Amino acid sequence: MTRSVLLAAALLAASAPTLASDVVRHKLANPMLPISGAVEVPAGKTLVFVSGAVPPISNTSAPKDSVQAYGDTKTQATGALRSIEAQLKEMGLTMGDVVKMQVFLVGDPAKGGKMDFAGFTEAYKQFFGTAAQPNLPARSTMQVAGLVSPNFLVEIEVTAVRP
């Protein structure tokens, strides 16, 4: 009888869904960057690929066809990340479920055409590596020549794992 119970318990445990905590986030060798060096997703997990998010208009008094309407890199990144957060929430996910992020930054005219990595990082740190949401995704950040609108400085894609 005991043997049957143990066998049943083992089979039940083996068929139980994998918990979100089963995702392994490997620390980056350089602890100065708030990202994971790598993220392992166990077999059987559902990956959710979220299309690129661009910023909403943040300054309604600026001309709609201007960079000023969308703000600087930090403002644009914050808006895009809020959009991603809302989209994930609609799917029953959170920013803590994000395992991979790709960030496309256009050179900021106010910064001599160079990407504002520091401004992006300030926005990013509001959503990742906080006391409330400590999970860090693996991330790639790159400067690109342009995005779909000449007024966008930021576009962000994420991949999340369904817990």
Regions found by a protein language model. Give the residues of each.
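N-terminal presequence-like segments and the immediate start of the first folded domain
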Residues: 2-82, 86-102, 108-163
